[in-house]
Structure formats: C-alpha cells, structure tokens
Amino acid sequence: MDREEAAKELMAMLEEAQEGPYYSEEEVRAHLLEILAPRNQVYMTGDTHGQFERVIEFCARREVEPENTFVILGDAGLNYYNDRRDRKKKDQLAQVPITFFCLHGNHEMRPSEELGYEVAEYHGGKVWMQPAYPNILFAIDGEVYDFNGNSCIVIGGAYSVDKYYRLARGWSLFPDEQPSEEIKAKVERVLAERNWKIDIVLSHTGPLKYEPTEVFLPMIDQSTVDKSTEVWLEQIEAKLDYERWYFAHYHTEKEVGKIRIMHNDYTMIPHEASVAAEKDMLRRMHRQAEIMEALGLLDDAPNQKNGDDIS
C-alpha cells in the first residue's frame, strides 16, 4: 500500500463510516502512517542472514527512493565469509535504490578498516562504509542518529546460543560478537550526557526481562547461554527515559509495551510531525466514535479488517 492507495482507502473508509461501519484505531493508524510519512522514510526489519529476497520485494513494492533508509536490526549477513560470497550479496543490495543501515549482530564480523571499511557520517552519527557500496552502511555502537526528528541510539551484538553446535561443525564464530566493555562504557557515557533520555533504542538483542522464552529452542541448555549483554541492557532500560525500543535476534515477532521484537515483519520510524498529526486525527476519531456510540450507531459494527503489512 503506497501513499496514494492509502489516501484512497482512507477516503473510502470515511465515506463508509457515514453509514455506520466502524473502523478500529489500528486500521486507521496504518493508513495515516503511510499518508503522513515524510519522503525520507525509514523502514525497519529483523535479521536477514543474507536472504534478501523479501527485502528487495518489499522495497520494489514500496517504490523506495535513494533518500529512504532501510534498517536491518543485526545479522544482515553481509560480513560473514569475507570473500566473493559476501560481495555477491552486497552487489545484490547495491541495485536497490535505498540506503541500508545495518546493526552489528552476532553471526557476522564487525566492520573495520581491515575489511575495507571507512568511517563516514550519516544522519548525525558515524557509520562504517565501503566505497564500492555507498548505500550499505553499518552503524557504530553507541552512536546517536537523527531519523525524522527522533534521536536513535544503536547497540549491536549478542551471544550465539548455537555456539557449540557451530563449533562442532566448523562454522564461523566471532569472538567479538557481544559488546565489549569499551562499547558498554561508550553507550553509558552517551546516554548520561543526554540525561538518560532518548527517543528510540535500536539494538540486536534486548533487555533480559523481555526475552521471548516461549520460542527458546528446547535443545539449548539455557544455563550455558551467556546473557551478560541482556542483563546489561536491562540495567540500561531500567533508568532510561525512552519512547520505543526495537530489537531482533530471537527470530520471532512480539510487542510488550514500548518494546517490539522484530523478525520478518516491517515497521517505520515516524516523523515527529506525522506523530503529532496522527494523534490529532485519532483524538478526533475517538470523539466521533463517542458521538456515534451515544447515538447507538456502533451496536451493529462489522468485523474489523486486516491492516497493511507495515505497523
């Protein structure tokens, strides 16, 4: 659903609403998010592990533009082999007219000068970039980026729960997969300088108390899993004043309060102006619903419909 389609559908919904059908707040919000979004849209998804077909299809469907940003919340799968196989994946993404903004995961090497990366600037923060692939960027942990008026701090890395499985098969394992003490100190220093207030946290794993234990693999002995990063993030979360926190890593999709765990789903980082407009529209919608309810027009409301693939 693009902006024009969203506008047409919302107009049709408003016309139908004059005759009684009631649309949910979530359904209206999905359309407003598309209509009110700025041109420099920021999309986001979870781990891709080198499988970019769904991302490329999504970008084609959305008719993305070079000034748009696509955030991958770690384990993009672009720095795994450090050979032609990685270059093939990068060549694939280089054809997509959008800037990919990747967090560091646990199943990949950290970008460095040794891998041919250079430090560049993007949306107010430092990133790693290879000159041959200027639209593929890797965030630097502890940096704060401005996406549509939102201050966003990045915290990559996690522990590989499949560590021993990978070692037994001779698969790659990266010793610096988790944030170092130096990185942790930087993150805490940056947040302290901001009086522990940030709009959005983008991380690969998340605070310990939000672990989706219901999807844990039964063959993994959790007592062998190093959860020091999650414990540290929980300590960060306890004293942080934030609006939203997005992370991936667990290959599941879940929302708990201000926390959202992402996998194959998509969302957008909204513009602060669009958020204000959305809230105003929703306030008016609530008022209209109250009036309709008082008149007894909501008693026979139809079943609610499904929204778009962005939420």
Each language-model region and where it sits:
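Structural motif
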Residues: M44, F70-L73, I200-H204, Y246
